[in-house]
Amino acid sequence: MTEGVQNERTGYKRVMLKLGGEMFGGGAVGIDPDVVQNVARQIASVARTGAEIAVVIGGGNFFRGAQLQQRGLDRNRSDYMGMLGTVMNCLALQDFLEQEGIDCRVQTAINMAQVAEPYLPLRAKRHLEKGRVVIFGAGMGMPYFSTDTTAAQRALEIDCEVLLMAKAVDGVYDDDPRTNPDAQLFHQITPREVIEKGLKVADATAFSLCMDNKMPILVFNLLTEGNIARAVAGEQIGTLVQS
């Protein structure tokens, strides 16, 4: 079942794509080359249309700082371990994008001069204007900030039009669709409705950044082939969170 206003959407010129690290592992620890290659092919097909694409990747296929903390590790140290995991994912995606013939740059919030550029928003925007895909690694470079928050902050700083949240579900539901077959998918919803209904779109800090700065969020299913292109083109997929 579906719910929400189904307004006509228009395509986007510059987007921020947030990818969960767990997807890169294919459900296991490490990197699944087949998954990363598939994602790279989807991004490459969109980049060839002239759309400007920035990417933030999580590191959950290697480390999750909060989970490591529960096992007794220092939270600061475990968060930095997670940041290093994101960089490994960034380099893997960069390699597969270059195999597709797409010019690509990795920028990190922690200085890693031998493998990536430092995060410089003006340089990132210039790369995008030249048709390069830009991948941001190492989160915010500080503990206690998620990669969802990184994606929201970077999207605002480099003037993206929308934050595309790639998930393993079709969008935002009023209940868990895996356990409730009658769960309703929202096609479009406002940030206020998300709060009132207690729905989960992104972590609280990321969601607040987007809401306060009127940054639309599109939650969609990455596992459906071609959905990145559909999302960038503004087709009616997933859930659009917009005032």
From Swiss-Prot:
GO terms for molecular function: ATP binding; UMP kinase activity. It is an enzyme of class 2 (transferase). It is found in: Cytoplasm. One of its GO terms (biological process) is 'de novo' CTP biosynthetic process. It catalyses: UMP + ATP = UDP + ADP. Coiled coil: none annotated. Its EC number is 2.7.4.22. Pathway: Pyrimidine metabolism; CTP biosynthesis via de novo pathway; UDP from UMP (UMPK route): step 1/1. ATP binds at residues 18-21, 60, 64, 173, 176. Disulfide bonds: none annotated. GO terms for cellular component: cytoplasm. The keyword Nucleotide-binding applies. Catalyzes the reversible phosphorylation of UMP to UDP. Homohexamer. Belongs to the UMP kinase family. NCBIfam families: pyrH_bact (TIGR02075). This is Uridylate kinase. It comes from Corynebacterium diphtheriae (strain ATCC 700971 / NCTC 13129 / Biotype gravis). The gene is pyrH.
